[in-house]
Swiss-Prot record:
It is a peripheral membrane protein. One of its GO terms (cellular component) is plasma membrane. PANTHER family: AMINO ACID IMPORT ATP-BINDING PROTEIN, METHIONINE IMPORT ATP-BINDING PROTEIN METN. It is an enzyme of class 7 (translocase). SUPFAM superfamilies: ACT-like, P-loop containing nucleoside triphosphate hydrolases. The complex is composed of two ATP-binding proteins (MetN), two transmembrane proteins (MetI) and a solute-binding protein (MetQ). Keywords: Amino-acid transport, ATP-binding, Cell inner membrane, Cell membrane, Membrane, Nucleotide-binding, Translocase, Transport. Pfam families: ABC_tran, NIL. Its EC number is 7.4.2.11. This is Methionine import ATP-binding protein MetN. ATP binds at G38, P39, S40, G41, A42, G43, K44, S45. The gene is metN.
Amino acid sequence: MIHIKNLSKTYATPHGRFEALRGIDLLIEQGEVFGIIGPSGAGKSTLVQCINLLERPDQGSISIGGQELTGLSEAQLRGQRRRIGMVFQGFNLLSRRTVYGNVALPLEIAGVPRQEIPGKVERLLALVGLEHLRDRYPSQISGGQKQRVGIARALANDPDVLLSDEATSALDPETTHNILALLRDINRKTGVTVVMITHQMEVVREICDRVAVLSHGQVVEMARTQDVFATPQHDVTRAMVSAATSSALTESTLAAVQARIAARAAEQPGSAARLWRLSLTGKDAGGALISDLARQHALDISLVQARVDDIQGVAVGTLFVLAQGTPQAVNNALAALAAHQISVEEIAHEPANDRPALHVAA
């Protein structure tokens, strides 16, 4: 378990003090894959450096497995850091060492008896699928294979925690998928806690059990991955989810729906027309509930746009629907959606120019 309490970090700059982290509180359970995501400058890299105490925070505490780290001396920290493996974006392999030699290096530094090293390295290479490349040099293998070497090296001292700092951001989509599958497999086989630092929502969607969203050095949202995709609460999260799923309406689609709402208001004064964004999960995500809603409440419901994503085996649907009928029927339908615990965001209504703000795709 990783427990971070009230963590803050400030840097001195030529323009004054810069607050990189402010009041961070996180509880990461043992054995889970936890994502930390945010735009550039959000504080992600500073946070990961604080977790392994490469950067000392100005205030707050960091505990791993019940051991508080911020009060330890440098000598004590060296021992504790063996419990934390690190996978980097840039691989950081030694060019003059073979694949085998790079994985063996942390064992040599840790003082593992020489006769025990070969067996341990061979097991690690088998775990990451590189036993056939043991005698190759970094210049002779691909980027994805280099990252596998980095993962094996990070696991050499049997860490409790594996920190992945943008480990897939320099890889192509297929290689990224393979590396994420490997990390998930390692997590399941060894029980190591994996912390994924990333700016890619696609990475979070594929591997993370839970996710914390950082913005300007603060945690602005934290939830299960499927909940973050289904019902993002913060503007930063909504923007990142929309970009990853293309789940927002385009300007042209919104304008067309507004024209339909205006036309209905002119033709049928007193009637109601609402454009809703519905977020559904599980069995409801396919949209069968919508047809039931129309039938039960005598509504005319048009599907404007829909998308269903598989978030680690859970269907998460985003539906934009135009509901038209009497005001009472519309209110009854809203009550029914609330009873099913379905998130509803009203995007537009009559009159069309008196509508809430919308998160619109560019």
